[in-house]
Amino acid sequence: MKLRVLAVGTRMPDWVTRGVDEYLKRLPRDFSVEIVEIAPGKRGKNADVARAIQGEGNAMLAKLRDQERVIALAVDGQHWSTERLAANADHWRQDGRDVALLVGGPDGLDPRLLSRVEQRWSLSALTLPHPLVRILLAEQLYRAWTLLAGHPYHR
């Protein structure tokens, strides 16, 4: 199984890249995670937000693979404990399909993407900045793996 995080946003600050890399480098090859950056749609004072979301959606749809399990990080998704995430990851691994985790832009995901998802996952009821979401997601994926592997990181 290969995990890919398709995330709207490019050119993250160095502290984000370092934080994400710190967790992802600890994962074994059979639980590897790839970050795929999607260029954000143009936003500004007179920007058409719907058009920006559609552009981001087009880019994400182009990156999705046919047999991938698609999971959206969405405000209306289910709240998972670390144990639930680990159980889901174990199921994904046993299923054998690759997994794409979708992280939308500041205005959310294109509805066309949401019609393709198999699960919706909410990281928090809080509003989180996108750079922090990447680090939090990387850490939780690492923590889920440690739980499955019996590693002492998760206590």
UniProtKB/Swiss-Prot annotation:
UniProt-listed Enzyme Commission number(s): 2.1.1.177
PANTHER family: METHYLTRANSFERASE, RIBOSOMAL RNA LARGE SUBUNIT METHYLTRANSFERASE H
Localization: Cytoplasm
Assigned protein family: Belongs to the RNA methyltransferase RlmH family.
Major location (coarse): cytoplasm
Protein name (record): Ribosomal RNA large subunit methyltransferase H
Subunit and partners: Homodimer.
Keyword RNA-binding carried by entry: no
Broad EC category: transferase
Domain of life the protein comes from: Bacteria
GO terms for cellular component: cytoplasm
The reaction(s) this protein catalyses: pseudouridine(1915) in 23S rRNA + S-adenosyl-L-methionine = N(3)-methylpseudouridine(1915) in 23S rRNA + S-adenosyl-L-homocysteine + H(+)
SUPFAM superfamilies per UniProt: alpha/beta knot
Native source organism of the sequence: Chromohalobacter salexigens (strain ATCC BAA-138 / DSM 3043 / CIP 106854 / NCIMB 13768 / 1H11)
Residues at which S-adenosyl-L-methionine binds: 73, 104, 123-128
Described purpose of this protein according to its UniProt entry: Specifically methylates the pseudouridine at position 1915 (m3Psi1915) in 23S rRNA.
Keywords assigned: Cytoplasm, Methyltransferase, rRNA processing, S-adenosyl-L-methionine, Transferase
MF annotations from Gene Ontology: rRNA (pseudouridine-N3-)-methyltransferase activity
